[in-house]
């Protein structure tokens, strides 16, 4: 049995002038890589966008990360026994589980699946006082996003879930320099003899071709969700990673784009981030940045496979420019093939 199975996602995506992820001063986030400044989008920002995409799919079991965990349990209690004092029972259920809560909510954000909230509610309605049962109810039945992104509970590490997915900070394949947009706002009801602006301001932005990378530990995921749901979850993760985008300043820039090229691999050794393809920044040229970035990614991947890393067990590409790595498919065909490949691999490993 091969206990290692990873799905790596590599995406090249061009975004126009935008500020989709900004720092505490309002500037687009950046990073120095290869000695030059790059545009950067944090992994947290893209994971939040992915979780929002999950929530839009009614077929997916998505959890809630909130300080109002008592409200989740309360809703389940009301569904089971509306005549009971749901507020009191929900707070007591969390207390029995070791999760501190008051009228303002839990002390920290708590990640809970619908199944876990329902299990706590059932124990509360039954009148159980066994604290171990309440704690155990939070240790099983994670939602798919909890299994992917993990859960950390500082007060009770036994409730932690290891994340099966890792998402890298996206960086531009080339050097960038932030720019400023000077804007004004005019008062629509202002007198005609006072034509000046009522508000002046600036917004900082940049544009870039981003290299985006994420990996999913399939065996870890299957251990938490089971083989069938793990395969479905890998597909959902891939779809969300391909098509989601953080929403920062989206009304100002309308910057929602789709990937230029996608490369997905099924690996049986370890995850391999191919960001090294862009350690030397792609130079400015008449071709733009997307085309030479594709060439650099393909060349670097082949170099890695001929020297350090084994070639992937299976590879898939979407879009043009990476056909040397695998035949190009549509996004839907690739996701279908990926789900089947993961399902078959888990079946071969006899993971239930």
PLM feature segments, named:
Residues 1-40, 46-352:
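Basic polyanion-binding and macromolecular-assembly surfaces
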């Amino acid at each position: 049995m091969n206990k290692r199975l990873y799905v790596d996602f590599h995406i090249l995506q061009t975004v126009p002038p935008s500020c989709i992820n900004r720092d505490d001063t309002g500037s687009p986030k950046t990073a120095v890589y290869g000695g030059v400044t790059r545009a950067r989008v944090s992994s947290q920002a893209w994971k939040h966008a992915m979780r929002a995409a999950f929530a839009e799919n009614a077929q997916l079991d998505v959890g809630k990360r909130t300080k109002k965990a008592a409200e989740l349990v309360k809703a389940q209690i009301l569904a089971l026994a509306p005549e009971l004092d749901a507020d009191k029972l929900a707070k007591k259920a969390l207390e029995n589980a070791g999760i501190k809560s008051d009228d303002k909510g839990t002390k920290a954000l708590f990640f809970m699946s619908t199944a876990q909230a329902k299990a706590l509610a059932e124990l509360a309605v039954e009148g159980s006082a066994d604290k171990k049962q309440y704690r155990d109810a939070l240790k099983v039945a994670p939602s798919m996003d909890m299994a992917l992104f993990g859960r950390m509970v500082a007060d009770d590490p036994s409730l932690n879930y290891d994340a099966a997915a890792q998402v890298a900070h996206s960086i531009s394949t080339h050097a960038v320099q932030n720019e400023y947009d000077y804007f004004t706002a005019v008062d629509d009801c202002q007198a005609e003899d006072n034509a000046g602006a009522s508000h002046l301001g600036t917004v900082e932005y940049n544009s870039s071709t981003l290299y985006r990378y994420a990996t999913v530990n399939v065996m870890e995921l299957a251990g938490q969700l089971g083989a069938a749901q793990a395969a479905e979850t890998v597909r959902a993760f891939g779809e969300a990673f391909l098509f989601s985008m953080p929403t920062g300043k989206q009304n100002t820039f309308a910057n929602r784009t789709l990937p230029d090229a996608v490369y997905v691999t099924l690996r049986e050794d370890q995850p391999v981030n191919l960001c090294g393809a862009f350690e030397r920044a792609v130079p400015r040229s008449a071709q733009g940045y997307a085309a030479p970035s594709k060439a650099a990614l393909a060349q670097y991947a082949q170099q890695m496979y001929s020297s350090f890393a084994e070639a992937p067990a299976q590879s898939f590409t979407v879009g043009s420019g990476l056909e040397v790595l695998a035949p190009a498919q549509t996004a839907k065909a690739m996701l279908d093939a990926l789900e089947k490949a993961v399902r078959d691999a888990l079946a071969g490993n006899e993971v239930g």
